[in-house]
Curated annotation (Swiss-Prot):
Its EC number is 5.6.2.3. It comes from Buchnera aphidicola subsp. Acyrthosiphon pisum (strain APS). It is an enzyme of class 5 (isomerase). CDD domains: DEXSc_RecD-like, SF1_C_RecD. The gene is recD. The lineage of its organism: Bacteria, Pseudomonadati, Pseudomonadota, Gammaproteobacteria, Enterobacterales. This is RecBCD enzyme subunit RecD.
Length: 602
């Protein structure tokens, strides 16, 4: 097994850390060595635990390399009773004592993952009390916010936040999550007898910028008195800033011994939050704080291990308990589908609302059609993409050097309006908005189809056409119109990770990068004081999360990568509001959708 796992590292099936962890756990026991490597590897892909069925059905490393799987099976005994064999080993326990791995309810965990999951679900079970509300008053508030007669899942979501102490609101792009946040804030303030402390937060600086836009919405003037406006939060903050997390130690200033003084905490883009961060959030708030989480569980998961939102959403289809159903019906005046959840996990499903209606894409939209087909694995619709039969979506093959060159030329043509605005000396706002209409997205950083080389190739093409002219500052290449993306939050310069600005020269001849802020003002930063940035003709899908563009180009690598999966593809596709160009090999595209990424069951 040792030799095989070493080979797996060379073949890039697993990471070096997965190999070393397996050796740390068990140097001689083939079964435990394999299990340790699998758990470590799959945790890096967002899975909190692995069911025993994963091993019984030989899904090792979610690999499609049949030769490699067969070699593993030859080393193992023909018939293995996995739970019995695992619990024989000293490094695996049942959670009663600290062991590197834990086997619990036919699932195997890293100890820290098991501990965090246990704490989170214990919190959901014990702390989610139902709030005593003025039903007549709350029902009237909901009626004012949602005057339409048709059933609105947004209304159900807002009702749940009034009833529950913890609520999870799930929805894809265009399902009205932003509108729902607005109406939640209005409903909570209007229903409260006193002034309340509300805080909005998100995992990234870019996402908090979006929340700050919500707080500046004029709709609050229509609903609130001057006294009620005092309950509006002044600004959104990142989760790290909110909890006072130290950069090196990762310890939180706020914790169970020093709780945040809040009545309501609303966290957006919760899909980016990993299981360990979720545990920190829950341990830092008081038992009376109302928690509202909002996100899309189909989007890319967190960079760190463990997609807790996906785990929680597993229970979404179970329906509401009878008690919750009655409460929702009384508040909303709706008649809900009588699918009553009698399971012991209804303390989770009672807190979930899935926003189903899409307000951004109508059902004839190409983006909606393709993204929906990908998750439902509708082969006929997906294959119709290849002959460009899906509205406003264009597929280009990238199997040859000639096709690659055409891709670069095609992309450059989409910047004609941007360059024209620069040459005609349009306002900086107009120039930035023109750039923001079109964005190139890549899956990877490196390689021929990664952001680093794509950015270089685009610059080379523009240089050959005399579109850009280089000059050097401190040995670095610059040119007018160069797009720059910030990669670290910088509060002193008022820029966030993911912000994109455009290089220009001001009236005094100083080279600067200009960023369009949420209030439509321009933030100009001289190049000489700018730090931590990258060229941004192309950015990764991960960096684009939370953004949207009218026109998007999505570039897939020319090989199967563990980073390229259905979630990445879905996230990339749904960044576009209207037009999408996909550059990919057909086989790679199909394999990304149909490969066995969902064999790991909760």
């Amino acid at each position: 097994m040792l030799i095989l796992l070493k080979k797996a590292v060379k073949l890039k099936i697993i990471r070096p850390i997965d190999f070393y962890f397996s050796q740390f756990i068990a140097q001689k026991n083939n079964i435990v060595m394999l299990v340790a490597a699998c758990v470590s590897y799959e945790s890096s892909r967002g899975y909190i635990s692995l069911p025993i069925k994963y091993f019984e059905k030989h899904y090792f490393f979610s690999s499609s390399n049949e030769v490699f799987i067969k070699k593993i099976l030859t080393l193992l005994e023909k018939k293995i009773n996995w739970p019995v064999e695992l619990l024989k080993h000293a490094s695996i326990g049942n959670g009663g004592t600290s062991t590197p791995l834990v086997l619990h309810k036919k699932k195997i965990y890293l100890y820290k993952m098991w501990k965090s999951e246990s704490n989170i679900f214990n919190y959901l079970y014990t702390k989610n009390k139902k709030n005593k509300i003025n039903q007549k008053k709350c029902s009237k508030i909901l009626e004012n916010l949602f005057p339409q007669k048709n059933m609105s899942f947004q209304k159900i979501a807002v009702a749940l936040t009034l009833i529950n102490n913890i609520t999870f609101i799930i929805g894809g792009p265009g399902t009205g999550k932003t509108t729902t946040i607005l109406k939640i804030i209005i409903a909570l303030i209007k229903s409260s007898k006193k002034s309340i402390k509300i805080q909005l937060s998100a995992p990234t600086g870019k996402a908090t910028t979006h929340l700050n836009e919500i707080l500046k919405n004029n709709i609050f003037d229509l609903y609130f008195s001057e006294k009620e406006k005092c309950s509006l939060p002044s600004t959104a903050t990142t989760i790290h800033q909110l909890l006072g997390i130290q950069k090196i130690s990762q310890k939180s200033f706020f914790n169970k011994s020093n709780c945040l003084d809040l009545d309501v905490l609303i966290i957006d883009e919760i899909s980016m939050v990993d299981i360990l961060m979720m545990e920190k959030i829950l341990s830092s708030i008081s038992k009376n704080t109302k928690l509202i989480f909002i996100g899309d569980h189909n989007q890319l998961g967190p960079i760190e291990s463990g997609s807790i939102l996906r785990k929680i959403c597993y229970y979404a289809n179970d329906g509401y308990s009878f008690k919750s159903m009655i409460s929702i019906e009384k508040l909303t005046q709706y008649k809900l589908c009588k699918k009553i959840n009698k399971k012991t996990t209804n303390f989770i499903s009672d807190n979930i609302c899935v926003l189903n209606k899409n307000y951004r894409f109508n059902k004839n939209s190409g983006i909606y059609t393709l993204s929906n087909a990908i998750f439902k694995k509708k082969t006929r619709i997906i294959e119709s993409l290849f002959d460009n039969s899906i509205k406003n979506i264009f597929f280009y093959e990238t199997n040859s050097s000639e096709q690659y060159k055409k891709m670069i030329k095609n992309i450059c043509l989409n910047y004609e309006d941007f360059w024209e605005k620069i040459y005609k000396k349009a306002t900086m706002k107009e120039i930035i908005e023109s750039f923001q209409n079109y964005q190139v997205l890549c899956i990877l950083h490196d390689g021929l189809f990664g952001v680093n080389i794509i950015n270089k190739k685009l610059e080379e093409n523009m240089y050959k056409k005399n579109i850009i002219k280089y000059f050097y500052i401190d040995g670095e290449e610059w040119y007018i119109g160069k797009p720059i993306m910030i990669i670290n939050n910088n509060r002193a310069l008022n820029v966030s990770n993911g912000n994109i600005g455009i290089t220009n020269i001001n009236k005094n001849g100083i080279l600067q990068v200009s960023f369009l802020k949420e209030n439509n003002t321009i933030n100009n930063i001289p190049v000489k004081i700018l730090r931590n940035y990258k060229t941004a003709w192309a950015i990764t899908v991960h960096k684009s999360q939370g953004s949207e563009f009218m026109n998007t180009a999505l570039i897939l690598p020319n090989f199967n990568s563990h980073i390229l999966n259905k979630d990445t593809l879905y996230t990339g596709i749904t960044r576009s509001r209207k037009i999408l160009s996909i550059f990919s090999d057909k086989k790679i595209f199909l394999n990304t959708i149909f490969k066995n990424t969902n064999k790991i069951l909760f």
